[in-house]
Amino acid sequence: MLRGARSHLSASVALAAVLAAALLSSFARCSLPGRGDPVASVLSPYFGTKTRYEDVNPWLLGDPVAPRRDPELLAGTCTPVQLVALIRHGTRYPTTKQIRKLRQLQGLLQTRESVDGGSRVAAALDQWPLWYDDWMDGQLVEKGRQDMRQLALRLAALFPDLFCRENYGRLRLITSSKHRCVDSSAAFLQGLWQHYHPGLPPPDVSDMECDPPRVNDKLMRFFDHCEKFLTEVERNATALYHVEAFKTGPEMQTVLKKVAATLQVPVNNLNADLIQVAFFTCSFDLAIQGVHSPWCDVFDVDDAKVLEYLNDLKQYWKRSYGYAINSRSSCNLFQDIFLHLDKAVEQKQRSQPVSSSVILQFGHAETLLPLLSLMGYFKDKEPLTAYNFEEQVHREFRSGHIVPYASNLIFVLYHCEDAQTPQEKFQIQMLLNEKVLPLAHSQKTVALYEDLKNHYQDILQSCQTSKECNLPKVNITSDEL
């Protein structure tokens, strides 16, 4: 009976997915502006963590599978011997929480009184169906699978020695348990299959020559396993004070009034959360289907900058420099990366083949941001607060430019045969979103491997996740009892 119920549920979900895809396809065929629409393009830089990868790397709009070799990449007598990549999942559906807020907003529109000669945007939204459903809940979309397949093709072309056919069986893949990450890892493998076997359909991941992706949430979702983070940040009602304060601040109030006028609803019926989900709906429609939604017409660039800052405040205080535990909770992941690199160095020194030339780890924006913060990247002189929006217009910390969908942080270890000293034989570069990332401490584009380890010595040797994440014990004296 239970099996039959499950089969019926699966069939219903599958049918809903097909209908949703067909509905979206019909939207795209209607006389709607496409990806090159000017309004969508001017808002795109401000979508925060809901940003398309190609908006960070515009050259991909021309040819999404052609690699772009950064001129700063090492070449000549230095040969890449290992690549360790931390990859965010591809484009996804909104979460159930976001979908329910959108339904609430649509309900407000349906109950408003129509006004003759009223807002063109409000009229367009009246005709725009709400196609999101609860079952979608953050799952990877087909565009997200495409993100991963194309990234695989580009990396394989950029580092042919590492992604050679002989190394395929020795690939190591780690993933978060979330479906969007598991599915992203599978799509990446399909892209590699396409690289090795052009024109042939890929088999199931379980039938490929390499080992299937292995779930490891202690690495990819370290924040869920850090009691200090969970208590002091995740479950702490005051931890995101600056986020909540900005929601009621003058910048957001200006946006609220403008949006209320555009939608023809009382301003008291709106709040910052509803406004933000409307803005994200513009980004979802663009990212998932490449269509220009009427939700995009609700906002202008000034509104977008305010809403981007609201999103960045949350990322800053919950995942980055706002609290030390945000980044210190990622020490285990950072150390794991260097364990792989150390092993490769040791094997090369012994004239042995590198056992794992490519290690791929699939996680979340919440995986990447703390790690980059731990390494000292994108840190502004002044913290982001609810009260310095104007001063932070040119800030370094813009989450959409750092961790869009499919974002990736790559460590490339090189063996330099003609090095003058033993220390120079092993050098390292980092790439963020396929562009060489200058070292945070020196701004150089390449480092001796030992020098980089020395710079991060405290993290590699002294940062123990068990100690970092333990809550301080509260001593209760007999007087207090």
Swiss-Prot record:
SUPFAM superfamilies: Phosphoglycerate mutase-like (SSF53254). Keywords: Cell membrane, Endoplasmic reticulum, Glycoprotein, Hydrolase, Membrane, Secreted, Signal. GO terms for cellular component: endoplasmic reticulum lumen; extracellular space; plasma membrane. Residues 1-30 form the signal peptide. Pfam families: His_Phos_2. InterPro entries: His_Pase_clade-2, His_PPase_superfam, Histidine_acid_Pase_euk. The active site is at 89. Multiple inositol polyphosphate phosphatase that hydrolyzes 1D-myo-inositol 1,3,4,5,6-pentakisphosphate (InsP5[2OH]) and 1D-myo-inositol hexakisphosphate (InsP6) to a range of less phosphorylated inositol phosphates. This regulates the availability of these various small molecule second messengers and metal chelators which control many aspects of cell physiology. Has a weak in vitro activity towards 1D-myo-inositol 1,4,5-trisphosphate which is unlikely to be physiologically relevant. This is Multiple inositol polyphosphate phosphatase 1. It comes from Rattus norvegicus.
